[in-house]
């Protein structure tokens, strides 16, 4: 892991394990989670590492992937993350979650994530995303790189107001870890294929229903979530009960 500084900024360091070792690690996690074992790394046009996390709606998916960002940073030093969402409404919701959980994660990880919503007219944020050594999170909706409007095409164009660089090249130079929120809502045609331009180190897919399955490493359905909440509640009740003499 770790973050490499190549002069232009701090990018995610490459994955060190071989594909065989990676698959073994995935199988270990699957075994712990009582999930079917993968026979191979499921590769896509976009990345050679594609992990599926299956979580029902309402089970804290956004919280889970924000925590994953901090854990990956703590354990492997990776610091460049892009959360890809299917709509502007979800994009705003994710940004809000990053904002309201900041203090909570600061207590555990002693750092804050610098996050921003990608906007082709405000590329100074992207500049900071590359040059900053801390945890950096970009939130982008698929329309921003997949629609045909003038503003949406800017991501692929050499821009005078961006030192004659293409935003997509600056993004790709970071070798970001991609987090796809509800990928099944973005799997129309070439949408996800165009993520190859981001040159991701790996792709993590968080969804209740995966149309296409890759290497599944976690599954939490509504019943599991309910039971876990119940267990939490019961243990809290147990702790808070005053001890009575017999």
Please give the residue ranges for each predicted region.
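Conserved nucleic-acid-binding Ia/Ib motif block in the N-terminal RecA-like helicase ATPase lobe
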Residues: 95-136
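Walker B catalytic acidic pair
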Residues: 181-182
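Walker A/P-loop
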Residues: 47-67
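Post-DEXD/H (motif II) to motif III coupling segment of the RecA-like Helicase ATP-binding lobe
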Residues: 188-234
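Conserved Walker A/P-loop ATP-binding site and its immediately adjacent core
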Residues: 79-102
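Walker A/P-loop NTP-binding motif
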Residues: 63-77
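Conserved RecA-like ASCE ATPase "motif II neighborhood" in helicase/translocase motors
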Residues: 123-128, 137-175, 186-193
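Single conserved hydrophobic/aromatic residue that forms the stacking wall/gate
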Residues: 238-246
């Amino acid at each position: 892991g770790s973050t490499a500084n190549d002069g232009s900024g701090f990018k995610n360091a490459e994955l060190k394990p071989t594909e065989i070792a990676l698959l073994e690690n995935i199988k270990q996690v699957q075994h712990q989670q009582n999930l079917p074992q993968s026979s191979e790394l499921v590769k896509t046009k976009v990345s050679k590492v594609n992990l599926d996390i299956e979580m029902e709606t309402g089970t804290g998916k956004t919280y889970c992937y924000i925590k994953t960002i901090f854990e990956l940073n703590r354990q492997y030093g990776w610091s460049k993350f892009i959360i890809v969402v299917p709509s502007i409404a979800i994009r705003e919701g994710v940004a809000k979650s990053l904002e309201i959980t900041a203090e909570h994660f600061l207590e555990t990880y002693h750092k804050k994530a610098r996050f921003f919503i990608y906007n082709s007219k405000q590329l100074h944020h992207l500049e900071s995303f590359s040059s900053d050594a801390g945890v950096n999170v970009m939130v982008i909706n698929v329309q921003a790189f997949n629609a045909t409007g003038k503003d949406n095409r800017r991501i692929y164009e050499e821009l005078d107001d961006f030192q004659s660089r293409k935003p997509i090249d600056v993004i790709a130079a970071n070798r970001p870890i991609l987090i796809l929120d509800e990928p099944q809502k973005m799997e129309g045609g070439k949408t996800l294929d165009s993520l190859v331009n981001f040159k991701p180190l790996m792709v993590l897919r968080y969804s209740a229903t995966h149309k296409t399955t890759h290497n599944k490493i976690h599954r939490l359905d509504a019943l599991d979530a309910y039971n876990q909440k119940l267990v939490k509640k019961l243990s809290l009740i147990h702790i808070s009960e005053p001890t009575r003499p017999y």
